[in-house]
């Protein structure tokens, strides 16, 4: 018996990183996983795993989301993972940077929840998990102005949905990681003028002396997706190795 037997889980940004690790972890625990991403080639790699089906989806496009939602008969868990990390202070951020991050990091979750929540309400049960960060309203982080603003908004969105629909059988939580070793992190490190120094800076702020793995975060997501967390809602759940202490 798996911890997620029989559950239908839809997640975004499943082609790599935390999304991919979570899709695999959900499937191992018996869930029927519908994994979405804009990256078709990487997404197709998941097709070989039992319990996972894939669908190309741009979460910034409302029409695509609404069409996708119309094709799904039942959903138990919605996991909104898609996001982008902008590097810099407010002075390094142009309006287009702000708009892009807000669109991908916040508006996409708004659109996904709006599309799938009615199905959950009709079922009188549903579970929404949003990807936030400790770089948000939890902790001020240098050179993460836009990113932190978007992730603070995700916490607010999460709490609002949880409060509004708690009596209709809906739960909503968000995951707040610290620094996670993902392809996205490695790309950001390599994009810096001095990648070796950038890696050192990232590691120096880790009180555990290491990054989290995507698989560690995925295990927390399994718990939040399962009935084991049935009494947990409206929470920003921190997994950061003590970084925010």
Swiss-Prot record:
Statement: the UniProt record of this protein carries the keyword Kinase: no
Induction: Down-regulated upon E.coli infection to limit access to host iron pool. Down-regulated in macrophages by exposure to bacterial lipopolysaccharide (LPS).
Recorded superkingdom: Eukaryota
Positions of the catalytic residues: 147 (proton acceptor)
Binding-site residues, substrate: 144, 188, 205
Annotated NAD(+) binding sites: 16-18, 37, 58, 151, 180-184
One Pfam family cited in the UniProt record for this chain: adh_short_C2
Tissue-wise expression: Detected in liver, spleen and macrophages. Widely expressed.
Family matches, as InterPro entries: NAD(P)-bd_dom_sf, Sc_DH/Rdtase_CS, SDR_fam, SDR_superfamily_enzyme
Compartments where found: Cytoplasm
Annotated TM spans: none
Keyword Transmembrane assigned: no
GO biological process: epithelial cell differentiation; fatty acid beta-oxidation; heme metabolic process; siderophore biosynthetic process
One MF term in the entry's GO annotations: oxidoreductase activity, acting on the CH-CH group of donors, NAD or NADP as acceptor
Enzyme class, UniProt record, top EC level: oxidoreductase
Keywords, in A-Z order: Cytoplasm, Lipid metabolism, NAD, Oxidoreductase
Subunit and partners: Homotetramer.
Job description of the protein: NAD(H)-dependent dehydrogenase/reductase with a preference for cyclic substrates. Catalyzes stereoselective conversion of 4-oxo-L-proline to cis-4-hydroxy-L-proline, likely a detoxification mechanism for ketoprolines. Mediates the formation of 2,5-dihydroxybenzoate (2,5-DHBA), a siderophore that chelates free cytoplasmic iron and associates with LCN2, thereby regulating iron transport and homeostasis while protecting cells against free radical-induced oxidative stress. (Microbial infection) May play a role in susceptibility to bacterial infection by providing an assimilable source of iron that is exploited by pathogenic bacteria. Host iron-siderophore complexes can be used by bacteria to promote their own growth and pathogenicity.
Family indicated by similarity: Belongs to the short-chain dehydrogenases/reductases (SDR) family.
Stated name of the protein: Dehydrogenase/reductase SDR family member 6
Organism: Mus musculus
Gene: Bdh2
